[in-house]
């Protein structure tokens, strides 16, 4: 089975496409038995969403599948990693993607996602450094102001 590259997976489903997956999932849930494929399909659609709450539900469903259905773990690893990446949980994204790369070192999809994760980590680091720099500047100004008052 060929899985999409990370850039392809960033594309969201239309609301009507996601609704089809949700309806199937809810119908099976109401009957008392949700197939793994239906749960996976719905989770996949949710992870592709642009809404964090939907991504989070998708990651939760994928985690359930990952824990309960070992033959489906390979498929889950990529989408768990993607979901965590999209939500900014870079440590979790790295962890799941590393497991996939460990199993399949030549997996171009996982390598592509790994590049996105590393860019996200770097971007987060730059933002953190900017915030620290800004806080240091504000603190310096405040200290200078206090020192001037103390001299008067």
UniProtKB/Swiss-Prot annotation:
All ranges on the Mitochondrial intermembrane side of the membrane: 148-152
Gene Ontology MF annotations: lipid binding; molecular adaptor activity
Record's function text: Has a role in mitochondrial fission. Has a role in outer membrane fission but not matrix separation.
Residue intervals annotated with topology Cytoplasmic: 1-126
Family under the similarity heading: Belongs to the FIS1 family.
Gene3D superfamilies according to UniProt: Tetratricopeptide repeat domain (1.25.40.10)
Alphabetized UniProt keyword annotations: Membrane, Mitochondrion, Mitochondrion outer membrane, Repeat, TPR repeat, Transmembrane, Transmembrane helix
Statement: the UniProt record of this protein carries the keyword Cytoplasm: no
Membrane-topology descriptor: Single-pass membrane protein
Encoding gene, per UniProt annotation: FIS1
A Gene Ontology biological process term: mitochondrial fission
InterPro entries documented for this protein: Fis1, Fis1_cytosol, Fis1_TPR_C, Fis1_TPR_N, TPR-like_helical_dom_sf
GO cellular component: mitochondrial outer membrane; peroxisomal membrane
Ranges that cross the membrane: 127-147
Swiss-Prot/TrEMBL domain comment: The C-terminus is required for mitochondrial localization, while the N-terminus is necessary for mitochondrial fission.
Name of protein: Mitochondrial fission 1 protein
Subcellular location field: Mitochondrion outer membrane
């Amino acid at each position: 089975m060929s899985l999409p590259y990370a850039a392809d997976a960033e594309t969201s489903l239309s609301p009507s496409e996601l609704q089809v997956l949700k309806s199937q999932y809810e119908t099976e849930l109401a009957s008392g038995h949700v197939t793994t494929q239906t749960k996976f399909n719905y989770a996949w659609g949710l992870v592709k969403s642009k809404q964090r709450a939907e991504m989070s539900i998708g990651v939760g469903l994928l985690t359930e599948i990952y824990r309960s259905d070992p033959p489906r773990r390979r498929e889950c690893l990529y989408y768990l990693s993607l979901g965590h990446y999209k939500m900014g949980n870079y440590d979790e994204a790295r962890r799941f993607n590393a497991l996939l790369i460990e199993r399949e070192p030549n997996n171009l999809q996982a390598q592509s996602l790994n590049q996105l994760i590393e860019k996200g980590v770097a971007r987060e680091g730059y933002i953190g450094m900017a915030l620290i720099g800004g806080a240091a500047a504000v603190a310096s100004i405040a200290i200078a102001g206090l020192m001037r008052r103390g001299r008067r």
